[in-house]
Amino acid sequence: MNLSYTARQFLTLPALIWVCLSAQAGRPLTVDDANVNDTGVAHVETFWSRGADGARVLTIAPTYSPLQGLDLIAQDARTLSGGPHSQTIQTKLQLSQPRENGCHTALVFGATHWQKGQGQSGFMSANLSCDLAPGALHWSLVSSRSPQGADVPSLGVAWEHVMGSWTGHVESVAQRQAKPMLGVGLRRDILPGLQLDGTWGRMGGQTLFSLGSKWQF
């Protein structure tokens, strides 16, 4: 997606709010889902985000699905003001197939490396997505280890709802020793294979937002 994003304090490493919390969630979600691309399909997500501390981050995240139920994901997140710069690689394995009015699951495994001597960390998440009559519900439980070796768990919940040509969502993320995040977002396909999206949220009394795109081919 959208993360995820842990292995750091939300306010001190703002880039990670979009990197490790839910692993790399599909835009514009922060909470990861249990969905994957169709076999042989790739996409590239590019988005600009403002963290709760005001830092601006540019993120580029390509994804490719070489096999059914498998996504291979890379991500580069660069703080434009010269702060943290990270690269993330992760694998998402879908454990059960999506079904109408039912639920499916996925596991995610990944690692993030920070430049400028800030170390690296690993993470994994268990994701559940349910197709319900009015929309879709997503849960993501993440276990992440900080560069200092501390376990930093988080739990995210998101609700998506289709409104004509737009899809909106509301989501919340709770992480140990951090203020909870509450956010909303919108996405829309403007051309075949091209999506534009945006998010707005609050965390610890501060505002965070993002603008992005997703190109699928």
Language-model features: locations:
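Cleavable N-terminal export/targeting peptides
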Residues: 1-30
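Transmembrane beta-barrel domains of Gram-negative outer membranes and organellar outer membranes
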Residues: 24-217
